[in-house]
């Protein structure tokens, strides 16, 4: 009886102990905050859901989402001409309800498509980037306040982290320079 009570009290504590992966992610996120990045846990639409995932057993539609970490870098000042753009990766090139931007990548709204197409420097950079970026990156997000890369954090190695930080810095600079040109016109 005493052993049972001990186990009853102890077992929930085991779930509170972080795993080695959770500890690595916490260290990486802490480092990101030191590198002026903001990290948020976000949910993005799952574009490759099959019929069994979209509808439950009662026939009610479910919104399929993927949990990921958004590593974001703030712009120097708000860029009012930048709409919210979510460029999503679609594995196996299944761009069901999306507008195709690049091979395996698309947006869900016409305004997002137009924004990226009209800014040739950003479009060309993304085209080169997305063809060889880490496969764990699931989305690229633009807003008037910041630029972000959303990824699954499966490969949380130093090299991948440094690559993502470098991409964010280049994309931030490119977006600010491009919007400066559009503001002056």
Region roles according to the model:
Residues 36-41, 85-88:
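Short secondary-structure junctions
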